[in-house]
Each structure stands twice: as C-alpha cells, then as structure tokens.
C-alpha cells in the first residue's frame, strides 16, 4: 500500500534503480549462472536415465516401492515430481527461463558495455600513461612517420590526430561472446517453445486405413489444443525378408489427407521418415490387423486378430475362424509374421495344417473324421498394420540456428582484440600496446613492429648523412 501512495514518477524511478542496481547484478552473477547450468545438466541426465513419457503401469513395473532404486526412487516419486516428463515440467522450464535471464543480464551488464568501449578510441596524451601498458617502449629521436602504414599492413584500423595515434584489430573477438550468449538464448527459447507446443504420438494404422493424430504419449499445453486436423492414410504396409527369414526393412506407403484431399504421398522406412508442416512420421512398429478369408463358396469376410505371447516369449497373432454358421465350432488360426503362412489348430490344440495367403486348404481331406462334409478355407489376404511414431517440435529451427551461431561465436571469440598507442614528443616516440589473449603472439608482433620502426627510421637517416658527408 505504501508503494501506491508514492508519486508515479518516484515509483518508476525506484523500480528502475532496483532493476539496474540489484536485480541485474544478481542475475549476471557468474556463480548463479554456473549453478543453474549444473542444475540443468543434472535434470537433463535424469531425463535421460529415467524413461520419458511412459504409462503409469510401466513405472510401477520398473520402479517398485520394494526395493526402491537407490533407496528412494520409486514410481510414486517419479510421477509426483514429474520425472516421467522432465522436459515439460513447470520447474524445469522455470530453470531454463532463469538461466536465459542470467545470460541476458550478463550480456547487458558486461559483454555489451565491453563492446561499446572497444568501439571507442582514445589517445594517450602523456608519456606517463604508457607506464600502465604491459607492452611499451621508447624510441629516442623517432616520429610517427611510417608507423600507420606498418600497422595497416598488419591488419590494424588506425586513428591518428597530430602527434597521437591509436590502432586496434580483432574487434570481432569482442562480438563473439555476445553472439555466443545470443545463440544460447536461441537454444533455450527453442527448447522452451518445443516443450510447450510440441507433441509425440503413436498410431497403429492398418493397410488401407485412415487415422487422425490422437493417441498422444506426450504433449505441451499449447499442443493439446492445436493438434493437426489432417489425416494419415496407410495405403500399404509390407516387410522385406531375407532368404533366411530375417527382417531386412519395414515399409509404409503413406498419404497425408487434408480435408479429404491427398496433399503428400511418400513411402517411409526405418530412418527415412515423412515430414509435413513441421510434423515428422517415423516407421517405429508393426502389427497384424486382420485376415480376409472365405469358407467354401461364402463371400470374403474379415476377421480381426489379436496378439498373443508364447511361453518362449515369441509374438504371434491369433484369430478364431468359425466353421459353423452359429459359430459353435471353429479353428484357431495363428500367424507368426506377415509372410502369409497361417497355422491352423482345432479346439483341442491339434495341428490341422498350414495355409498360405492366396491358397486354400480342404479340411475335409486333412481330417475327414472331424469334418465329414466338404469344408475348404481360402486365405485371401493378411492385412498388416504400420506403427507410426509421430513427433512435432516447433522449437527445432531455433535450436539448430542457435547451435550454428554458437559455433560461429566460439570461433569469433578466439580472435585477439589488440590495441596499440603511440605518442610523438620532442625527444622521441612512445609506443605501447595490450591484448586480451595470445600474449606471446602479441609480444612477438609488438617487438617486430618496434624493429621495423627502428629500421625505417635508420633508412630515413641515410640520405641526410650522405648529403652532410
């Protein structure tokens, strides 16, 4: 209440002083930045070790309460702290924002003023001023003649006014740290934007089927309200097998449908995804959806299959095939893969034979006692289903741009920012310089400059001595 009783101008002035003299120095503190960076590293490692975006049942199975991992890490701890989606938790995003604020404050209070000072130039007008420079010398009876040309040949930008000279090079080295900070801010902004507006989903689509993006495994708050409205059609799914039966590659012929119209079509495979409007579709899984069969002269009908596990852990797909109109009797059909070979068993588990896609099996000939009447099964088609992992991360362009600028900024930061001053007096020439890195290299450069200046001065005296002689 006291604040609002103050005049508005005084309140704004107090707020500015607090921001400039208290908040900015606190945010720009190197210790705070290092602490936040370590916290981000630890939390990122936690998100790498603990599986992300899994179901509660998964964490209950892998992180039981007894015994607890490391004595404390249980599924309850993981779910309550949000460790199952670390990168989307409010506290992780808050740490990223705080770290970004620290970088921005450091740039405003340190890097930007350093760049502004580096762009200015000032002359040293007194010989005593050269005593503060780490590299300095005095050349009796010499002048500035020829020195600007030598400095320009070495890449310096030279400023001269009368008997005063100032030269600098490597200003890009002062820009580099600022570019590094800007690039890191871009990376942070991209990560934050991706966390709140990106999503991950999984869809299992049978061949010929159409599906929308709806089975989310992880999504930011903005993404849930703005999911893509276009649909995915799986025109065909197939598997290439090697001669020994091993899987060579998985393929899905996909179409993107926008308001019923096909806007893009592409065949994807493992490591070769489809991208559309910032959404990427990866080939991630597969299954068998159903079978199309005929019995004797009946029309073709479609029967769904369900996945089953054997005692050895092998995955099969099974379906009940009725042999009577009232479905009182039937056979169990098992499919081990998409190669089109089905195994038939009776209700007692006795093997009745195998049936290949596009072929038929006369059961009355295989088991005449069990099937006295003519009974022929036709397996017309085994319908596979493609498992797609769908990802959208709108922050990726900013992250990529940030990493690109980061590499450029790091290289720029290695350029030395070097300065040289010179003062001509009645008795001689004062010369001095300094640099922010590569001191040995600059020392050699400075010594070479001094020697060149001495040689130039000596050569300038030869014609004069000849005339005197």
Swiss-Prot record:
* Record-annotated membrane-spanning stretches: 30-50, 89-109, 175-195
Task: Tell me, in a sentence or two, what this protein's role is.
Answer: Required during biogenesis of c-type cytochromes (cytochrome c6 and cytochrome f) at the step of heme attachment.
Q: Which GO terms describe its biological process?
A: cytochrome complex assembly
> What are the alphabetically sorted keywords of the record?
Cytochrome c-type biogenesis, Membrane, Thylakoid, Transmembrane, Transmembrane helix
**A matching Pfam family:** ResB
- Protein's name according to its UniProt entry: Cytochrome c biogenesis protein CcsB
Q: What is the phylogenetic placement of the source species in the record? A: Bacteria, Bacillati, Cyanobacteriota, Cyanophyceae, Synechococcales
Q: Does the keyword Transmembrane apply?
A: yes
State the InterPro entries in the record: Cyt_c_bgen_Ccs1/CcsB/ResB, ResB-like_domain
Quote the cellular component terms of the Gene Ontology held in the record.
Answer: plasma membrane-derived thylakoid membrane
- Bilayer topology term: Multi-pass membrane protein
Q: Does the keyword Membrane apply?
A: yes
Kindly give the HAMAP family that the UniProt entry links to this protein: CytC_Ccs1
UniProt subcellular location:
Cellular thylakoid membrane
Q: How does it assemble?
A: May interact with CcsA.
